[in-house]
Amino acid sequence: AEDRKSLSGLTEQEAQEFGTLYTQGVAFVAVIAIVAHALVWAWRPWLQ
């Protein structure tokens, strides 16, 4: 039984792994952005 390939060319297992890594990457960038905004807010608050 060979693995059926999807339109993306990934197997289900590969797609699951990619999705996990992608989600972790997005979360990492979001945390960096939140920390950066907090630091800038501490330096020069906006919307007073």
UniProtKB/Swiss-Prot annotation:
Annotated PROSITE patterns: ANTENNA_COMP_BETA (PS00969)
Top-level taxonomic group: Bacteria
Keyword Ligase: no
Bilayer disposition of the protein: Single-pass type II membrane protein
Segments forming a coiled coil: none
Gene Ontology MF annotations: bacteriochlorophyll binding; electron transporter, transferring electrons within the cyclic electron transport pathway of photosynthesis activity; metal ion binding
GO CC aspect terms: plasma membrane; plasma membrane light-harvesting complex
Periplasmic topological domain residue ranges: 44-48
InterPro entries, per database record: Antenna_a/b (IPR000066), Antenna_beta_CS (IPR023623), Antenna_beta_dom_sf (IPR023624), LHB-1/5 (IPR002362), Light-harvesting_complex (IPR035889)
Gene3D superfamilies: 1.20.5.250
Assigned keywords, A-Z: Antenna complex, Bacteriochlorophyll, Cell inner membrane, Cell membrane, Chlorophyll, Chromophore, Light-harvesting polypeptide, Magnesium, Membrane, Metal-binding, Transmembrane, Transmembrane helix
GO biological process: photosynthesis, light reaction
Summary of subunit composition and partner proteins: The core complex is formed by different alpha and beta chains, binding bacteriochlorophyll molecules, and arranged most probably in tetrameric structures disposed around the reaction center. The non-pigmented gamma chains may constitute additional components.
Family: Belongs to the antenna complex beta subunit family.
Protein name: Light-harvesting polypeptide B-885 beta-2 chain
Species this chain originates from: Rhodocyclus tenuis
